[in-house]
Amino acid sequence: WDSGFIALGYSHFNLKYALDEINTLLRGQWKDGMIPHILFHDLNTNYYPNHSVWNCGNKIKSSGITQPPVLAIVLRKILDKNKINYKEITKIRSIIKKVIKYHKWLIKYRDPNYSGLVSILHPWESGYDNSPLWDEPLKEIKIEKDLKYKRGDNKVINSKYRPLDIDYDRYV
């Protein structure tokens, strides 16, 4: 969903950048329509969980979870704000087809009872990745002692702004 918001920002000064951002994300779309929350263009193993942990993706290695479906709203805002030429309309039509495929995936796999409510399977899918809202439900997850992985997120950003190790253990 980050790419959607980045594209929306780009659209204020460069429509090509905005459409390129969305198309880069959509290159990682799975055959069944799912859009993963991370695409691993760089197969760096210093990030955890990395591409080898997820072991997912078609042409581009990816995570196995998604994030909130904001692309349709983003596209609407981009179209409302910009004058679109014929070449851009062709690109946008291609994007719209892929977004529709994603929405069909959400209905099929995340709302099989057609309740209108899409399910999430992991806190990272919510858009509220490290929110305290998850503290109570995650306490119910029993974790193994001494999980073998190295975090990189708390090395790049001050660890006081990142989840505690016990919370991260529950995420993974």
Task: Give short role names for the model-derived ranges.
Residues 93, 103-172:
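Extended ligand-binding clefts on enzyme/binding-domain cores
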Residues 2, 51-55, 164-172:
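Short glycine/proline-rich turn/loop motifs
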